[in-house]
Design a protein with these regions (language model features):
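Radical SAM enzyme core and accessory elements
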Residues: 199-202
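Conserved AdoMet/S-adenosylmethionine-binding subsite of the radical SAM
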Residues: 20-164, 170
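Extended low-complexity acidic/polar segments
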Residues: 54-65, 182-195
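A structural motif corresponding to the C-terminal lobe/cap of the Radical SAM core domain
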Residues: 148, 154, 170-192
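Electropositive phosphate-/nucleotide-binding environments in soluble metabolic enzymes
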Residues: 13, 137, 182-186
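Canonical Radical SAM [4Fe-4S] cluster-binding loop centered on the CxxxCxxC motif
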Residues: 1-13
Length: 202
């Protein structure tokens, strides 16, 4: 947490085996409910060796990893091999817009997405809808085109923009002023369903 006058570091450091033991305490619940463990973030692949060790220790438990896909290809393949389900974030199909808004183009992300598609591994694509940034029908259609011929694709989840983060800004002495219309209606109709993709708007 960061405040105007000081920084406070929160959390507990632990080794992968200790964390795995804690997770496995819920094994009976996982087995009864059909649930499991999801690694998300931040970006879980930023701690690649730790993530791979933990995934191995949790073999037998359903393991899901959510990633932005901007991960070195060898590491992505290793993580993919060790998971049961991938949650793959796609922000925009356009490389220039991706570079403008994130600081990097999406070439590596698209290569990893292609690897994911070819693997046949079950996956879900998640698209955060940011008004005026990536919510155009053109971008949604381009995103749908990226997902053609993907036998492992379970569904596409569109994550509507929400204002929850705005409440945190005053805590760090800042005003919340998003550079877009937060009330805009995303133009996403008819982009995914004609392609036969299951769509969930959250």
């Amino acid at each position: 947490m960061r405040k105007k006058d000081r920084t406070e570091v929160c959390g507990v450091e632990m080794e992968a085996d200790e964390l795995a033991r804690r997770v496995l305490r819920g094994r009976d619940l996982f087995d009864q409910s059909g649930g499991g463990v999801t690694f998300t973030g931040g970006e879980p692949t930023a701690q690649g060796p730790f993530l791979l060790e933990l995934l191995a220790l949790l073999a037998g438990v359903h393991r899901a990893v959510e990633t932005c896909g901007h991960t070195p290809e060898p590491l992505f393949r290793q993580v993919l091999d060790a998971t049961d389900l991938m949650l793959f974030d796609v922000k925009t199909a356009d490389p220039e817009r991706h570079r403008y808004y994130t600081g990097v183009d999406n070439a590596l992300i698209l290569r990893n997405l292609a690897t994911l598609k070819e693997s046949g591994k079950p996956f879900i694509v998640r698209v955060p809808l940011i008004p005026g940034v990536n919510d155009s029908l053109e971008n949604m259609r381009a995103t749908a085109a990226l997902l053609q011929d993907a036998p492992g694709l379970q569904r596409v989840e569109l994550l509507r923009y929400h204002k929850t983060a705005g409440a945190k800004y005053p805590m760090v002495g800042r005003r919340y002023e998003p550079p877009f219309d937060v009330n805009a209606t995303p133009a996403v109709h008819d982009a995914f369903t004609p392609a036969g993709m299951k769509l969930l708007v959250l």
